[in-house]
Amino acid sequence: MRQKKHIMLLAVSLFSSTLFAQNIKTVTSKSGTVLGVNKGSGVKIIKVEGEKFKDLNQNGKLDPYEDWRLSVEERAKDLASKMSVEQIAGLMLYSQHQSIPAGEVGFGAGTYNEKPFSESGAEASAISDQQKKFLKEDDLRHVLLTAVKSPEVAAKWNNNVQAYVEGLGLGIPANNSSDPRNTATVTSEFNAGAGGTISLWPDGLAMGATFDPALVKQFGEMAAKEYRALGITTALSPQIDLGTEPRWYRIAYVFSESPELVKAMGKAYVEGFQNSGKDAEINNGWGYESVNAMVKHWPGGGPEEGGRDGHWAMGKFAVYPGDNFNDHIKPFTEGAFKLDGGTKKAAAVMPYYTISFDRDDIYNENVGNGFSKYIITELLRDKYGYDGVVCTEDRCNTNFSCTHEEGFLDEGNLDWTCVPPALITAASAASGNGEMLEDLVDEGVGSCSIQIEGTDIKIALG
């Protein structure tokens, strides 16, 4: 069981730098704690012993999870006790790619009042029918943003989403995330938000060619401010794979083939994104300018057999003809997991689709990294002591039966799965009475909460 100290409370609403633009009010408690409330959510401020609190579940009283004076452990335990199996499952899910406004055809298409956007009369910042469904019916809170009409539209959409979910159930906020978006050109689904009207920077190899970690850290600090202004609190980056296979088409997005250089650059990137400046810091490096960094791809996505990428079956194997497996994990274990700043480590890590061929010397299984007890539990969790969030690659398990999936969730030691909600429901049903998911309260929910609470919404940050 992961220790409770890593559980961060979910029920403190997100702030963005654009909160003044919509119906959001702030109140300051006697001790100086600032709370933000969406006027349309139905959530009210209550006073207890002269201090102010948000009545997130709207029951007219102060519950322990709403009391910012209590410890992380006390608040988390109370929140977990109030959550249903379905809500727990929702916190372990990620949305499909969401463009703002939603596209009208193809992957990720959406509607507004059952009409395509162009015919709906809706504002570009409105919440689509599909978004309302996964937020309300599926209890999903981790949302992946791609292209947005403008920064203003993105900020307003975020505020609309936060107002919507604040009025649902326990008031758990949305954790909006993004693949890298500060480059000039969209090349694939994993940088579909690039090319927007924010600062534009070189991609990985070009940044690596500067040999300047300080510059990369500066980029992280600037990009984090932009992300927060857009309402984004998790960066699905950096990509700290080693570029050891020149035929791999994702090599342009890595810093180098050198373990030492990638370690230094990746560490600087995470420090820049996660650590708030002195005036913006609230606690332990986290603050109003912090964005959670999800490093990828554990245990290294670079050694693709023949350069064929793991997004496709033809590239399913990661191979190590020079037996350099340990070089590929060095940017994680000696860089992203050992930060100098107050946040200490990257908030999350993503394993790659690939099968790390013949690396499992305990269970002797050649399975995808996200399904490998050896890669995730024995190495990442136990040997290297990583206790942050582990999030699978997108749609890594679309062809698995619920029996396989149940074992994957139960034994894989993962926190987020990029799978359809129906798969979690099926797994729960397969377990008979939902016991499998209930057992994940202390593990999955605890780490999932880091991402939602990892910025200024972290319980330790008020």
PLM regions: where:
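Bacterial N-terminal signal peptides that target proteins for export
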Residues: 1-8
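Bacterial N-terminal signal peptides
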Residues: 9-18
